[in-house]
Amino acid sequence: RAIDYFNNDKSNLSEPSNAFSIDDKKYFGTANDFVSIQLNDADKNAQDYNALKIYQDLLAFRLKDKNNLDALADADLKRIQFVKEHYFNKDDNEALYYEALKRLKTEYSKCNVGAIINYEIANYINQKAQEENATNTFTVKEALAVCDETIKNYPLSEGAKNCTALKESIFFKNLSLSTEETVVPDGAFKALVSYKNITKIYLKIVPVSYKDKDKIFSINNNETQDDIIKRLNAIKPVRTWNQTLPDSDDYLDHSTEIKIDGIKKGYYAILVSTNPTFTVSTGKEAVAITTLFASQISYVTKNSSNNENFELYVLNRNDGQPLQNATVKFYRNTYDYKQRKYIRTELGSATSDATGYVSKKISKQNTSYYSNENFQVE
């Protein structure tokens, strides 16, 4: 259809130097007012001009057909959406679009397209409610109210189905946990919890042998993060507890810092969940994982003039002093196409000197895009 062509921003229609611009709020007006607008004939080759002209012709035709309100409503909604996407002044096009939608809601409340219009209003309100803006007055609860109204008044309609999906996304539980990659052993540390639609979380700290790290966290064919969670749930935790989060019923994302008591030296996974069994049920429950080291050791890598050399300085994490006689093991991860997973190979080790310096020559002649080298300080 011609409208679909002109609605496509990627169409190859060339534009004149003084291209037609949708720069007046009158284009958001009623269908009757819109079809009466005199477009500038000098801009006949402009893409936006041709699109508006087609919308004028279509709406003029639909306005004469009193027996097909749905067709008129559908064309009018698409016209409003086109104007919004191509409106010159981006500062007020959102507000003009919202006002136009509210007008369409009243004008077409007695036809099925009214449900689609309601959904567009609910979706707009929900998106605006997510914005961190001091002048923002929209709330997700308003969007839910419009959805409930639509589902009640237009059951089985496309708009009602869209509203049901929007409600599910609004009620969806989000949860994540982040910490520093390395913390000092036996010292309390902070974690950032990001959440939505959650008031209480359950946490546990699981020790992970570094040699089993790749086996536990690798995802093979047909596996998902759920499989990682199952493997971690099979390991006895060193600690479990629960914590209440700051309550909020606004259906928005929030974050808060929590304190976690110190852990012994080692590598760990911390699981956070909305249920004490740490199991996933899409949308209804959530589980998140983060990993960290508890170590007194830190390091600084050095750019080597020789690409085959690994160079670094091993330091005490507390005072920054060099650590002598620290063992550094070097590894290569190479993707095995037959097994469809990365295979880890130890390449040797080296010991830091009095300045904490470590250097190890690693041949890269057999490496590829699907191979990488790394190290572990012990």
Summary of predicted features, one role per range:
Residues 1-378:
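N-terminal, cleavable Sec-dependent signal peptides of secreted/periplasmic/extracellular proteins
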